[in-house]
Amino acid sequence: MKIYLVGGAVRDALLGLPVKDRDWVVVGSTPQEMLDAGYQQVGRDFPVFLHPQTHEEYALARTERKSGSGYTGFTCYAAPDVTLEDDLKRRDLTINALAQDDNGEIIDPYNGLGDLQNRLLRHVSPAFGEDPLRVLRVARFAARYAHLSFRIADETLALMREMTHAGELEHLTPERVWKETENALTTRNPQVFFQVLRDCGALRVLFPEIDALFGVPAPARWHPEIDTGIHTLMTLSMVAMLSPQVDVRFATLCHDLGKGLTPPELWPRHHGHGPAGVKLVEQLCQRLRVPNEIRDLARLVAEFHDLIHTFPMLNPKTIVKLFDSIDAWRKPQRVEQLALTSEADVRGRTGFESADYPQGRWLREAWEVAQSVPTKAVVEAGFKGVEIREELTRRRIAAVASWKEQRCPKPD
């Protein structure tokens, strides 16, 4: 029996990055031998065991053979005669097909070290094309390591295009697509994930609502980058610097979906694209089974982001109504989330990357003023039933009006 550290732990250690999870491969052993040594078996489809002390995963070396469609159609073979090289060959990328023995020596049968040095994401073997999930995984790795200047090897991107055009991605379940997307949204450069999907044709298949934005012009006065798809990715890049939250990042990605519905004869204007985008957000989220809380924020951002841009022109009643519409009294975090997504929208434009966004500050200040109006005082004043709500709203509007007179500049 020989045990090797494999995959991401080896890769990230060589890149000087923190190692989160450690996975091990066991060569020359059997399930019974592992059980006798105190390991706990957890894998149903293939032999994976938990170490009795560390609870890290130890998998018997195995090979995989395509036996059906999609990413689940594989037959696994695990036996003492499966070599380490056999096991590493089934992995997706060469940088993930590295192993380390107990002496610290790196085993690299597929030039993963060279690709690490050259910052290349390259597939190990043609078997890559048998698993459509790998298209999403490579796009996610490209986003995860973009800050280290990694790029996808030309032949790997070509294979990803072939897989997409062959209809392989249609075998992916919504849950897997969303899981990879959610993971990509946590990276430092989530926009790279969607750019890679576009480069290989997968964006049109998996995210047609986003793909439809490319080639749709916006007024050059407000959008020097002109193309709405490019603006969307710039905005996603910007919000990744402002917030680590997946729901904020996803909402930003979806903020301009409505512009994809504008008839070409009306370009470059997109009047009413916010409310129009809400339906597309719902469509996308229903198809990918996006969690409700993430969906709800994306709907609100699509509907109201343009309203925040015009904040100085809003009357106090409209401002308080906005807080009602986003359910801020029960979910106050939405005020900050809306401020961040709107700021990213403004700064996600060519030449505006460092722009100030006072509307975000005014929104936050107005919220502090509105929520500081005490409900208790209204009740103690003798109001009952629906009168409490009406009087509370009246007092909130009055408080915001007083604040706006002093703190918010009047529109020209």
From Swiss-Prot:
Required cofactor(s): Mg(2+); Ni(2+)
Keywords: ATP-binding, Hydrolase, Magnesium, Metal-binding, Multifunctional enzyme, Nickel, Nucleotide-binding, Nucleotidyltransferase, RNA repair, RNA-binding, Transferase, tRNA processing
GO biological process: RNA repair; tRNA 3'-terminal CCA addition
EC number: 2.7.7.72, 3.1.3.-, 3.1.4.-
Residues binding ATP, per UniProt: 8, 11, 91, 137, 140
Span of the signal peptide: none
UniProt-annotated binding residues for Mg(2+): 21, 23
Binding positions for CTP per the UniProt entry: 8, 11, 91, 137, 140
Gene Ontology MF, one: phosphatase activity
Cofactor: binding details: Magnesium is required for nucleotidyltransferase activity.
Pfam families tied to this protein: HD (PF01966), PolyA_pol (PF01743), PolyA_pol_RNAbd (PF12627)
Disulphide-bridged cysteine pairs: none
Span of domain HD: 228-329
Domain notes for this protein: Comprises two domains: an N-terminal domain containing the nucleotidyltransferase activity and a C-terminal HD domain associated with both phosphodiesterase and phosphatase activities.
Family from the record: Belongs to the tRNA nucleotidyltransferase/poly(A) polymerase family. Bacterial CCA-adding enzyme type 1 subfamily.
Subunit structure and binding partners: Monomer. Can also form homodimers and oligomers.
More about this protein: A single active site specifically recognizes both ATP and CTP and is responsible for their addition.
Function recorded in the entry: Catalyzes the addition and repair of the essential 3'-terminal CCA sequence in tRNAs without using a nucleic acid template. Adds these three nucleotides in the order of C, C, and A to the tRNA nucleotide-73, using CTP and ATP as substrates and producing inorganic pyrophosphate. tRNA 3'-terminal CCA addition is required both for tRNA processing and repair. Also involved in tRNA surveillance by mediating tandem CCA addition to generate a CCACCA at the 3' terminus of unstable tRNAs. While stable tRNAs receive only 3'-terminal CCA, unstable tRNAs are marked with CCACCA and rapidly degraded.
Name of the protein this chain belongs to: Multifunctional CCA protein
Organism encoding this protein: Escherichia coli O127:H6 (strain E2348/69 / EPEC)
